[in-house]
Amino acid sequence: MAYERFGIILQSEQYDEDIGNTKVNQKMNEGNHYDLHRKNAFDRIIHSESKKGDNVINYNIHENDKIKAADNIFSSKLKMNPNMSYEMNINCFKNIGYGENQETSKVLTNSLSNNDINTEESGVVDKNSPFLTLGTTILNSNGKSRRWEQKLVHIKTMEGEFSVTMWASGISDDEYSGSDQIVGASDLLKGKEEFGIDGFTSQQNKEYQKMESKFTNAQTLEMPHPISSVQIMDHLIKERGNLSQENNISERILSKTTLSFEEPILLPDSSSIELVNETAAMTINNHRTLSNHTGNTGDLHALPSSVPFRIGLHEGQVNDCLSTISQSTHQDNTDSTGCGEMNLSEVTVSYTNDKKIACPHKGCNKHFRDSSAMRKHLHTHGPRVHVCAECGKAFVESSKLKRHQLVHTGEKPFQCTFEGCGKRFSLDFNLRTHVRIHTGDRPFVCPFDACNKKFAQSTNLKSHILTHAKAKRNTSISGKSGCSNAESNSQSEDTSANYVKVELQDSVTENHVPFVVYAD
């Protein structure tokens, strides 16, 4: 009985028994079956070609060995699980020397085709042959010819891509439609093949998609909400508004602060004293006698800083009559007469809540707001136990002695970092002063009108102010002495040279050294 299995017409008497035996765990070893029938087929071909001569037989034997070496072994196991689903396990794919033996296969095909023609003409066909191979033309159940060809098929799986050589029939669909087939076996085999490759691939794709979706969900990051630039600008504007409010409050406090004078201060009419420093600035525009005892009023304008200050007047070799200054609270301006020398170096201008705690050390007239500041200052009057071995200078603190010793050792640990300079200094103060040469910073400004000169060091500013005083002395009118009334006093004030000392309190400077400016 002829039947078709795996796309090949076979004839076997045991086919009925094979159809009846449909067990769930049926195992088919196709590889061994394939090799056995292929060997028998080639033996038949070689036997049929023996009549053409020994050369053809030897050639076929030689080509047979090459084809066996280059054969692609495709073995698969078809399993039927309890759920009646089939799985196809590809054991191995071997493709050895397919390109090298392609020409050999063509030569063998031509020789076999000639054999087919001779066989058809003689009418001798061995129906007991279980397998007919490459290039063999046979008759199916309807007597139509069929040609088997070898094709290269690409199979893609989850693990990789493989190339498999499979056998295919060269018959057309029209010729094949009229043939009688065993539907049960062909459909069963077709279903197994489709499920084995396509079904397995689709199932693996679905599982892969599920795993990918789970991985994607697991890797999803929760990003915070973006911060708007408008919110940032609002926050900055709000902070800036708070700072401006604080500045306005401080300015209002300074503008409303009234100054009380303990003793009268006489300023010349042309005096315009202005202190410009890194931390404080003060301008006094008053052309009258300032006294809170004589009924005269005094004004201080443009006070932009809350730094405490002191104003003292030093009279240098001037014998003027200052009848307008009275030491008594009930004396009148016209009652005071006479001439004399007066020392106004201790006259101060202070706030109402000025420092009240005085330094107890003899000869020190400094005052402080609290006792802790006074005790800190009192330490400077302590015993100078740290003495320099080189020059004999004594210091209260050891840090001051170490700084002084740098002068003798010549060590200069402070170096200028500007490119191309590299100068070194023994004191950090000198380095800061030197850096102003590179930066161009000049914080010390001349306080006189029409003179806007700036200096990097305070000593240079002091020397410059003395030039203004000398110039005024040279151009002033001298020779006026003696006074009897307020008019003579005002004239003597215009011609006199009074030096004004403006100094900041201890809390201003870093080393508690007052900053002093002398002005005419």
From Swiss-Prot:
- In this chain, the stretch annotated as Disordered covers 475-497
Q: Which SUPFAM superfamilies match?
A: beta-beta-alpha zinc fingers
Kindly state which keywords UniProt assigns to this record, in alphabetical order. Developmental protein, DNA damage, DNA recombination, DNA repair, DNA-binding, Metal-binding, Nucleus, Repeat, Repressor, Transcription, Transcription regulation, Zinc, Zinc-finger
What SMART domains does its record include?
Answer: ZnF_C2H2
Q: Does the record carry Amino-acid biosynthesis as a key word?
A: no
The cross-references to InterPro entries, in alphabetical order and at most eight, read: Znf_C2H2_sf, Znf_C2H2_type
> Which BP terms does GO give this entry?
anterior/posterior axis specification; chromatin remodeling; dendrite morphogenesis; DNA recombination; DNA repair; DNA topological change; heterochromatin formation; negative regulation of DNA-templated transcription
GO CC entries: chromatin; Ino80 complex; nucleus; PcG protein complex; polytene chromosome; polytene chromosome puff; transcription regulator complex
Which residue windows are coiled coil?
none
Record GO terms (molecular function): chromatin binding; chromatin DNA binding; DNA binding; DNA-binding transcription factor activity, RNA polymerase II-specific; RNA polymerase II cis-regulatory region sequence-specific DNA binding; sequence-specific DNA binding; zinc ion binding
Pfam families (UniProt xref): zf-C2H2 (PF00096)
The segments annotated as C2H2-type zinc fingers are 357-381, 386-408, 414-438, 444-468
Localization annotation = Nucleus
* Job description of the protein: Polycomb group (PcG) protein that binds to the 5'-CNGCCATNNNNG-3' sequence found in the regulatory regions of many genes. PcG proteins act by forming multiprotein complexes, which are required to maintain the transcriptionally repressive state of homeotic genes throughout development. PcG proteins are not required to initiate repression, but to maintain it during later stages of development. They probably act via the methylation of histones, rendering chromatin heritably changed in its expressibility. Probably targets the Esc/E(z) complex to DNA. Proposed core component of the chromatin remodeling Ino80 complex which is involved in transcriptional regulation, DNA replication and probably DNA repair.
Instruction: Give the multimer and partner information.
Output: Component of the Esc/E(z) complex, composed of Esc, E(z), Su(z)12, HDAC1/Rpd3 and Caf1-55. This complex is distinct from the PRC1 complex, which contains many other PcG proteins like Pc, Ph, Psc, Su(z)2. The two complexes however cooperate and interact together during the first 3 hours of development to establish PcG silencing. Component of the chromatin remodeling Ino80 complex. Interacts with Sfmbt to form a pho-repressive complex (PhoRC).
This protein is called Polycomb protein PHO
